[in-house]
Amino acid sequence: MSQSSTRKRLIQWSPHNKSSFIVGSNDLRLYNFKFKDKNEKKNENNINNSNQYNQNNQQQQQQQIQQQQQQQQQQQQQQQQQQQQQQQQQQQQHDIYSPKSITSKYMETYNFDIEYPPDDWVPQEKKTISLMSVNSDVQLMKCMAWCPDESDTNLIACGLTSGRAILTSFSSVNRILKELVPKHTRSCNAISWNPIYTNQLAVGLDKVRGDSSTLIWDINYLQSTTLNNHLHKNNNNYISKLQQQQNNIDQPYIISQISDNSFSTSTDYTDTIYQPISEFTQSEATLALAWLPNNPSCLLVGTGSKWLKLYDIRDVNSSQSVMAHQKSVNGVCVDPFDFNRIATMSEDSHIKVWDLRNLDDPLIIVNSNCKSIQQIDWCPTRSGVLASVGKDKSSIKLWDIKAPIEFSKSPKLESTTLSTGGGGSGSNTSNNLNKRSTSNNNNSQDPINTISKPTKIHHSSDVVSSFSWHPTNECRMLTVSYSGVIDVVSLNENIPISWSPHGGICFSFGNNVLEGPTKGETLEPNILNYKNLINDGRYEKDISSKIKERAIFGYSANVEENINLANKINDENINFLWKWIQKVPIQIQNFKRESSLISTPSISTTTPGGPITPSATTKTIINNNNNNNNNKNINNNINNINNNNNNNNNNNNNNNNNNNNNNNNNNNNNEYNGIYNILIEKDISTVESSNGFVIYKSPNRNLCLSICGWGFNQSLPLENILSRLEKSGEYERAAAIAVFHLDIKRAILVVTNATYNIHPVTQTNHHGHLMRQDREFSLKLLSIALAGFDGSSTSNNNNNNNNNNNNIWKETCKSTAKSFINPYLKTCLEFLASNSDSKDIYSIIEDSRINLDDKIAFSCKYLDYQDLIHFVERNTIRVIECGNLKGVLLTGLTGRGVDLLSNYIDRTCDIQTAVLAISLVVPKFFRDKRVSKWSSIYSDLLDQWELWHERAILDIQTRISGIDQPPTPQIFAKCGFCQNSFAFESISASSIVGRNASSKPNFKAKVPFCPHCKQSLPRCCLCLLPLNCMVPTPEFKKSNTTIGSGGGSIASSGGINNSGSINNPNDSQLWSNGSEPFEDWFTWCQTCRHGGHSQHILDWFKDHSICPVTSCDCRCSQL
């Protein structure tokens, strides 16, 4: 018992019968696997009971008949009377004890009507295994293979430890049909049937001196097919008893529970074959075999000396070999879905997948994470799925080499050698192969894909000895342990889920594809019940659903419509973007118009924003002149940071530098510039001192303030903005903006109004009440601090007592600001308590969490030029890295704006907003390859959703915003002599016709010759008049040129320059001037080269189909 428990057991499904399998070790056993439900078993038991009851009744009936016969002998005198009584009694007994009456009596209680199961119904089907037959003639077996021939479904080949290969069957009288005997006794390691030529059997043996280890046998299968007709007729009772030994395998099936009552009838003569038809692999052990289904003459051999060899049995001298592993090749198998893909294993932990078309390197290396692999096998029903089990392991691992998993690139684990030569492996061959291995190892350094994580792992209760895939069921596998436990394993693969572009969901299970509902309403609770919660626990809609809804609503490149859709878009950042796009072009245009009307003075004591108050101290600073050296360094640092940032964001774009240069060149024309580009331009700043704070003013700063919403003037006073913020409930921001403009009285009024307006709060819960109290307390505290502010606190002319009081007030404000939660209130007190120095204010605004537009406007007002550029630069880089749409305030729709949108797409996947926004400037002002890719992706997305109208609007708007470029001509008419074009814009000034010019000013003239070489043009084949060419006249030259002071000819739109060629060939007026009526166009056949005027040719072919040229049979109109 102990020996059998440690001996390796083999298991294999039948390729012919889906419910049969064999288990081999010391004997060979045939099993039947099926599903059986509880009702069926119960009915069979009842039927068996009724049959047994019928048999008992029949025996009783026979005993009664014998007693009646004895009574007839004793009562001979009354035979007639007794016979009559006997007949009556037999008739009564027959009516009572007949099988029909017994069956009907006991079977009428069983109801086989179909009943609907209840809601809590659980299926009662059970998996059962039946032992069908035992063949004890096969002993000491090491390998086995089921014959693939359909004509004999029970023929099995077994390899023994003695080296013999025997053919056995469960349906023949002689259990051992044939024996294949090698010359030398040695262990049989592998056996494999040819899948096409089923009479050929390959056997792999251990090595022996002077003999081959790979033998190809011809079993003469045609003579053995008659053995199927000799059935074993005397073992029916035995088989019927074995069929009753059924065990439920919800727990693993144990072989030791089966009785060892086996039989052997090998008394008949057995055919023996001693001569194989082919022999390979000398002086090497053959450990693995596999035939190629697509080429039945080729055999894969895994040897004990690290080699994987491919033989053609038709030519023993031709072979191809590769050093597959560092140790012996213990297993090889061919993928049933791709015959060029094979897998090999060794004594180490690696499985290698090869392509037979290129055996230089393996395709994939699978790291099984075990010391040694015992068995591998491809799944016959799922492509690319490979199963493996380690030695002395209780787990089976599945590897899906086609699954979308992450492959890790790793260097080669070993040298791979490829050789082509004879089948032997002598010393010369080994030396050559070693040389080839060294050279290949030096030249080949490419990494190989490695898989180390299995897609699924099945853990068994015992160490697995062998496993076998089911031939048709993709989820079923059989395993057998060393102790004889058979387990039916269900390996359900992971369910893949896929979203459709229309929002539906689809998933698959096995061969079935299930699609969820795509229509219907989603049931949601009342949103009002959760309005007071910060997070109501519901996920937001997928970004694809949002993009589709916005496209249907009319979200496009139309700025006005997008602003009207603000409520439907319901995104603060997106709404900010489109409002900025709406107002920035108007503000920049107004700024340029005002700048062109006002001449720039050398020194000015006024600012573009208005006159300075008499009490203010004013000083004029000309930026980029007095501080030229410092500003140069700042600009150089900015350019270096820009280049580094662009290179990081555009690693795959080879034209980044060109794009950036084009972007810089078009900044002046781009109406969507950001604050960053505005501030780095040359500017004249004036300094004003007010309430102890230094205020910087300049035209560029005023433009930035206007873009940020701080451009207050007579038409838009500060009071209007503060009133609007108060109505919207933004009291903290309103008070802060009033403080930043040093209007302390108005800030105190805002705080006073806030304490009255936030008191009647509608929130009735406890949390809302506490928030209201905290807000009210913070505002009252701010009003107290504002009341103590003295505008002269920062002046240097104050006495010591005032300075001491102001210092105490400042320290108190700084400590109070730390307790504020609202960033605006905190920044207010820190600003008032500062020393009015640019560096001090820089540190305050840098750490502030107020809105970006207010932060930039505040810095433009109180920071000097160097601190301002540095601050804007740092914030520009920050918003680009975060992909914050509000950062377009700094970057604008420029090259850096594309970088910002790229990070925005990576963060939110909202490619729709990026495409629509950037389409306003690309390719109108500059080009970027990323924008082209985004547009293509968004267009494909609209096509998938079948939003054809929205796609058409996108194409139209994109084309309108782009540069008008006429399509390149596809057909050129040129002279047959000089090969120059007849195009109107290509004609030089020397070809202008002047001798036949009329007094009436014309811009074009017809000439019957080439304007370049003066050769005659061909004639029309119908009217026989020469074809004409359009050339410009002298009047055209005079009307399209302007004489400069130097006497040179300066060409205007559509004119002729000094070099003699016409300028601006894209001008529409020029094309209309140079065009010729369609009836005079050149028209010719591409086959016979005959032609003429277009109108003449059209008129001819209305009634004819053959060329008008005599002796030409070309059917020009039918081409």
From Swiss-Prot:
It holds the Pfam family MIOS_a-sol. CDD domains: mRING-H2-C3H3C2_Mio (cd16691). A zinc finger (C4-type) spans 973-1016. Its main location: membrane. PROSITE patterns: WD_REPEATS_1 (PS00678), WD_REPEATS_2 (PS50082), WD_REPEATS_REGION (PS50294). Zn(2+) 1 binds at C975, C978, C1010, C1013. Coiled coil: none annotated. This is GATOR2 complex protein MIOS.
